[in-house]
Structures are given as structure tokens and as C-alpha cells.
Regions:
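Bacterial Sec-dependent N-terminal signal peptides
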Residues: 1-23
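Cysteine-centric segments in proteins
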Residues: 19-167
Length: 167
């Protein structure tokens, strides 16, 4: 009887184990939306698509594969990325590394608006950044950036109290 009770209790736990993907939820900031707002994003190894249109170049620097770390202004990191316009303009630069507990932490510079040191636990890398920006109506279908929404996104969701570059 104890075995049956234990099996009934553990069965749902075993088969409902959540992955990191299951635990992910987007930031919901209720930023204004227009008829031109992009609705979906797809991040590939070298490019980023909005509503199935290639809009951005993604440069990943994954030094961790070779056991190395890259020196950045945020210290030695195993992972950094750049998101650029198709014309090569740097829009975002981000780094990610694991903390002492093994959780990924990220910092992003919003170069397009001259802001540095953005951090939010829901933004740990390029994919999560883009998913959250699209979910908060920052990009338009024509690959342009809604700068007002981007500034609001930065101000409302940045968890770093005093951001460098903000005077």
C-alpha cells in the first residue's frame, strides 16, 4: 500500500518536471502597440527575424565552448553577443555568465539609445532580450525600432538601481 501511495505521489512530479524553457515568462510592461508592431521573433545563430523577415545580424562570441573567457568591460565572460542592424550599426551588446549558484545572469548595453548596464533576471542572453523586446512592442514590421517604447522598456524593467551612462 505504501508503494502505491508513493508511486501516486511521485508520478506527477516525475513527469511534470519543468525545463528552463517552461519556467520562462516574458516581461509584461503594457507598452503602446501600433498596427505596424512586429508580433513574432525568431533568433538564429547569425541573424534575427521579425515576422519572418530578416532584420538584424547576430554575432555570438561563445568562448565557453573552448573553456576560455572573453575580456569585456564587465569582466571575463564566457558568452557575449552583438545585435546589429543590417547596415552594421551596433544596437545592443550583451554579456552573460553564471553566478555562484549556477544561474545565468546577463547585462546588456542599449547602444541605440546610449544606455548602458541593463539587467533583468528575465533577460539572460540574446534570445531572451529579443523575445522580451518584441513582447513589449519595441520593433516594427519594417525592422525599425520604436525608440519611445525601447526607452520605456529600459527604464521600467532595468533592475540596476543607478545605471552607468545615465547622468
Amino acid at each position: 500500500m505504501k508503494t502505491l501511495w508513493l508511486t501516486a505521489f511521485l508520478f506527477p512530479l516525475f513527469f511534470s518536471a519543468q525545463t528552463e524553457e517552461d519556467l520562462y515568462t516574458e516581461l509584461k510592461l503594457n507598452l503602446p502597440k501600433t498596427k505596424n508592431t512586429a508580433k513574432e521573433v525568431r533568433v538564429e545563430p547569425d541573424e534575427i527575424y521579425l515576422d519572418k523577415k530578416m532584420c538584424f545580424i547576430l554575432n555570438l562570441n561563445d568562448a565557453d565552448n573552448e573553456g576560455e573567457k572573453k575580456q569585456t568591460e564587465y569582466g571575463l565572460v564566457p558568452y557575449s553577443y552583438e545585435i546589429k542592424s543590417l547596415k552594421g550599426e551596433l544596437l545592443f551588446f550583451g554579456v552573460a555568465k553564471k553566478d555562484e549558484a549556477g544561474n545565468w545572469k546577463g547585462i546588456v548595453d542599449f547602444n541605440i539609445i546610449g544606455k548602458k548596464a541593463y539587467r533583468n533576471p528575465k533577460v539572460t542572453g540574446a534570445t531572451r532580450l529579443m523575445e522580451n523586446l518584441v513582447a513589449n512592442n519595441v520593433f516594427n514590421k519594417d525592422c525599425s525600432v520604436n525608440l519611445d517604447n525601447l526607452k520605456q522598456f529600459y527604464e521600467k524593467s532595468n533592475t540596476i538601481e543607478k545605471c552607468r551612462g545615465d547622468n
